[in-house]
Amino acid sequence: MHLLETRDLTHIYRGDVHALEGVNFTAERKSRIAVIGPNGAGKSTLFKHFNGILKPTSGEVLVRGEPITKENVREVRKFVGIVFQNPDDQIFSPTVEQDIAFGPINLGLDEATVAHRVEEALHLLGIEELRERVPHHLSGGEKKRVAIAGILAMEPQVLVLDEPTAGLDPQGVADLVAFVNRLPEEYGMTVVFSTHHLDLVAEMADYIYVMDKGRVVGSGTVEEVFTRPELLTQTRLDVPPIPKLIRSLRENGVAIDMAYTYEDAKKSFLDAYARRA
């Protein structure tokens, strides 16, 4: 049984706009999944089906093997938490602390449990000093962390992040990557995210879905997807700089191991240098 699954999922908006066409997707426990594709590929629409924000035109969405229904959608939203690309879409309380508490309160939790979850979320995102601040006076990166904290306080098993690095400075991106990579092992969570920053995908994901025009046009491990440049080119994407550079070196006769992350690339270059010395 998959933790999260879609079967032949199709969504048509008013005006006969086909946003999703026969999408099949699965997510397992403690996995990190990237969904990549150009603007308009259907990534955000797909994500909104994961916890019942949108209903399929046809096909189905299964959470822990059960279809999402009117009767169980509240439980589904405890299990699958979504952070939208624009944090202003989900931040609305007078203070950061109140905003993070909103979700747990609406789950019907007692005051002590709510307070504990808020403290945990503030600590996990490193935003304890923001607790009394007005959310709409925060920077874009701070708002993003508050939005994530608000979802984490509900303790979902699946965290869905729509373009989580959008609007973040380099340090904010590095912090987010480190944070996402902690969640599966330390908290047993599954993370599904979309991004246009393909250089980050190998740092953050175990598996990739490639979307274009509402369809899944390819999927596989980081290695399987990034060794198919034609797949990325046809979807107006490009192979990230690290594997592109190493592939070029290999094609020019340099004996160097393929790598996809910064740390692996550093090791490959040092090993190649040692062999030539």
Swiss-Prot record:
Primary localization: membrane
CDD domains listed in its UniProt record: ABC_cobalt_CbiO_domain1
List of residues binding ATP: G37, P38, N39, G40, A41, G42, K43, S44
EC id: 7.-.-.-
InterPro entries: AAA+_ATPase, ABC_transporter-like_ATP-bd, ABC_transporter-like_CS, ABC_transpr_CbiO/EcfA_su, Co_trans_ATP-bd, ECF_ABC_transporter_ATP-bd, P-loop_NTPase
GO biological process, any: cobalt ion transport
Membrane topology: Peripheral membrane protein
Compartment list: Cell membrane
GO cellular component: ATP-binding cassette (ABC) transporter complex
Keywords: ATP-binding, Cell membrane, Membrane, Nucleotide-binding, Translocase, Transport
Domain ABC transporter positions: 4-238
Source organism superkingdom: Archaea
MF annotations from Gene Ontology: ATP binding; ATP hydrolysis activity; ATPase-coupled transmembrane transporter activity
Pfam families (UniProt xref): ABC_tran
Quaternary structure annotation from Swiss-Prot or TrEMBL: Forms a stable energy-coupling factor (ECF) transporter complex composed of 2 membrane-embedded substrate-binding proteins (S component), 2 ATP-binding proteins (A component) and 2 transmembrane proteins (T component).
Family note: Belongs to the ABC transporter superfamily. Energy-coupling factor EcfA family.
Function: ATP-binding (A) component of a common energy-coupling factor (ECF) ABC-transporter complex. Unlike classic ABC transporters this ECF transporter provides the energy necessary to transport a number of different substrates.
Protein name from the UniProt record: Energy-coupling factor transporter ATP-binding protein EcfA
Species the sequence originates in: Methanoculleus marisnigri (strain ATCC 35101 / DSM 1498 / JR1)
Higher taxonomy: Archaea, Methanobacteriati, Methanobacteriota, Stenosarchaea group, Methanomicrobia
